[in-house]
Regions:
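Outer-membrane beta-barrel strand-turn architecture
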Residues: 279, 319-324, 361-365, 405-409, ...
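Flexible, glycine-rich linker and terminal segments associated
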Residues: 180-181, 185-188, 192-196, 475-478, ...
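Extracellular/periplasm-exposed beta-strand and loop segments of Gram-negative cell-envelope proteins
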Residues: 304, 339-349, 372, 377-395, ...
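Outer membrane beta-barrel translocator domains of Type V secretion systems
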Residues: 212-409, 515-517, 522, 591, ...
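Residues on the lipid-exposed face of transmembrane beta-strands in outer-membrane beta-barrel proteins
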Residues: 311-317, 355-361, 372-374, 397-405, ...
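Outer-envelope beta-barrel architecture signal
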Residues: 281-285, 324-330, 364-370, 408-416, ...
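Outer membrane beta-barrel transmembrane domains
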Residues: 437-561, 565
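Extracellular beta-strand/loop-rich repeat segments of large surface/secreted proteins
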Residues: 2-137
Length: 607
């Protein structure tokens, strides 16, 4: 055979044979199987070559036909290195093998470079007889020790069924050559004389074909990671608002809503209160793209190279005062999310969308935000068997609580926080490209994230910060079955997250922000996000501030003249106070912080 030649022997070969009176063969025919390239010529031996003198020489003998068979020759001689590919039935401890009545003088080795596994083993270690004493010293398996044999790069080093992965070694014993098989989570070492040492790898997922693990990996590194990213980024209102010093937040919340009413004391201007004026309320919109690049060494699973990416677009209602000193705002958001994973020859991709809402509460330096979101994902896995397609539904709820400790009038803020979240992921059952039925129990995951942020407010509006978080995942084991075989329950190990970010405000209506966080531990890599926020709507008519003058002080207080429609009238009981500027509101807030919201006439005169 030459020039990538292939020969298919679909029928038996039975030549002329002479025998003596005792039935022994005295003369027979010869079959010489020879190629010009061991890796690029193939002889498909799908039937018997009976009673022949056979030689193998510089080619590949392929006996794969999904059934095991014992080939028997009169004589066999390996003239030069020859590859051999065989069917293996682990359940019955049988494989394709070659026997002969006699063996010639071998000048090469029979390299077993590939195996087609027909069934799974029922034992921890399965041994199968392969070579007779006349051949056993010239057999080399496809996974030698490094540098021991010069095997072609295409030699198969691990062996697969649709569910399991196997390691195999060749054990050359006195009575013949044996192949030893064990699942991939065990390393076999022959100790001679039929003895063998079994060493566990420590990772139960090593026992399985990577193609069968793709559903568990997609649930953890795809959907679960996507929901956790959403929880990190959906608290945009509190992230932006609570980076601002307290006095500036007071000025924002009480913008155009001051009123004064005297108490009757000439030295006391009166009680400070807020008036609702819908025309002066503004909403805001924000957009936040994100991406992460990482590897995830899953507990009880493979090490996964993972990329997540997406964009959230949100809308915040105005901050409104409610009861007992609390303020609140609502946020609605939608998002696109995607992820891709790569591990052990498997490529997975997920794409989907989500929708959610957040309620954020503020009181002084305290904030509490709760978000609820739900979405769907369609995904595909590209494996050695083909492409799997599946659909996932996900939902979750998260709550983040934090408090600001301010120093130097808000120039420095230390903000400890706690994020708690619950994630639900359901992957619908499907049949993969190998014909295995994949059944998925819903994933229930709880995440606990204590963290702290150190924020600096500069004079020019820049707000750089440093953040540190510790992430624990609880009850997040994925539960998946393949043809009723329970697969390892995988989860993401705890990890630490730290990094830097910055915000910048422009003209009181715009804000830009960016962040880079490094992750170490159960996730290793970097998460990046950036975005832009802008206020929408326009200011209404400025609100006038009215003070009623009581009789006690009317004799010393000049009456104010008010012109309306070009007419002059005198209002003996009222006077008009101009709207306060933003700078005046901040200065006034400094005197009102944590007070009963009363002030003196002297304070107002200073303003």
């Amino acid at each position: 055979m030459k020039n990538n030649g292939k020969f298919y022997m679909a029928d038996n070969i039975d030549g002329t044979v002479r025998k003596d009176s005792d039935g022994n063969i005295t003369d027979t025919y010869s079959v010489n199987i020879k190629g010009d390239d061991i890796n690029n010529t193939s002889f498909y031996m799908l039937n018997d070559i009976r009673n022949a003198n056979v030689t193998f020489d510089n080619t590949t003998i392929n006996a794969v036909n999904n059934q095991t068979h014992v080939y028997n020759f009169n004589t066999l001689t390996v003239n030069s290195d020859t590859n051999f590919v065989a069917d293996v039935d682990l359940a019955n401890a049988q494989m394709d093998r070659i026997t002969a009545t006699n063996y010639g003088t071998h000048q090469g080795n029979l390299n077993v470079v590939g195996m087609n596994l027909l069934s799974d083993s029922t034992k921890d270690v399965t041994e199968i007889y392969f070579a007779q004493p006349g051949l056993k010293n010239n057999v080399v398996n496809g996974m030698p020790k490094t540098g021991e044999y010069n095997l072609p790069s295409t030699a198969q080093t691990t062996f697969y069924t649709p569910i399991y992965k196997y390691n195999a070694i060749y054990d050359n014993r006195d009575d013949g050559g044996y192949f030893m098989f064990a699942k991939g989570d065990k390393i076999l070492t022959p100790s001679g004389g039929g003895g063998i040492t079994v060493t566990p790898t420590g990772n139960p997922s090593d026992a399985y074909n990577p193609a069968i693990l793709s559903s568990s990996v997609a649930s953890q590194a795809g959907a679960n990671a996507t929901m956790n990213q959403t929880f990190n980024y959906s608290f945009q209102n509190s992230d932006n608002f609570m980076s601002i010093p307290y006095l500036e937040r007071v000025a924002i919340k009480t913008s155009n809503r001051y009123a004064l009413s005297p108490t009757g004391d000439a030295t006391d201007v009166g009680t400070f209160s807020q008036l609702f004026n819908a025309q002066n309320e503004t909403s805001s919109t924000w957009v936040k793209p994100y991406a992460s690049f990482e590897n995830i060494p899953l507990k009880n699973g493979p090490k996964v190279s993972n990329i997540t990416y997406g964009t959230l677009v949100g809308f915040d209602t105005p901050i409104k005062s409610i009861r007992h000193g609390w303020d609140r705002t609502w946020t609605g958001y939608i998002g696109y999310n995607g992820a891709s994973q790569r591990y052990s020859g498997v490529d997975s991709t997920q794409n989907g969308g989500l929708v959610g809402g957040t309620l954020t509460l503020y009181k002084g330096n305290l904030f509490n935000a709760t978000t609820v979101s739900t979405g769907a994902i369609v995904g595909d896995n590209r494996t050695m068997y083909g492409t799997d397609n599946y659909t996932m539904l996900m939902a979750g709820v998260g709550n983040k609580t934090g408090y600001n400790f301010e120093f130097k009038e808000g120039k420095i803020i230390i903000q400890p926080s706690m994020l708690l979240s619950y994630t639900f992921v359901n992957t619908f059952d499907y049949t993969n490209a190998a014909g295995v039925r994949i059944k998925n129990d819903p994933l229930h995951a709880i995440q606990i994230v204590p963290g702290v942020k150190f924020i600096v407010n500069t004079k020019n509006g820049w707000q750089p910060y440093i953040g540190v978080n510790m992430i624990w995942n609880l009850l997040d084991e994925s539960k998946v079955s393949a043809n009723d075989v329970r697969l390892p329950e995988m989860s993401i190990k705890p990890y630490v997250q730290y990094g830097v970010g910055v915000q910048k405000r422009f003209k009181d209506r715009y804000m830009a922000f960016g962040q880079a966080m490094i992750q170490n531990g159960g996730r290793n890599g970097i998460s990046l996000t950036a975005g832009f926020r802008w206020a929408i709507g326009k200011d209404g008519k400025p609100l006038e501030k009215v003070q009623r003058v009581n009789n006690k002080v009317s004799s010393v207080t000049p009456r104010a003249e008010v012109k309306v429609a070009n007419n002059s009238t005198v209002q003996p009981e009222r006077k008009i106070i101009k709207q306060l500027t933003p700078e005046q509101r901040v200065r006034l807030g400094a005197r009102l912080q944590d007070s009963t919201r009363t002030t003196s006439l002297g304070s107002l005169r200073q303003i």
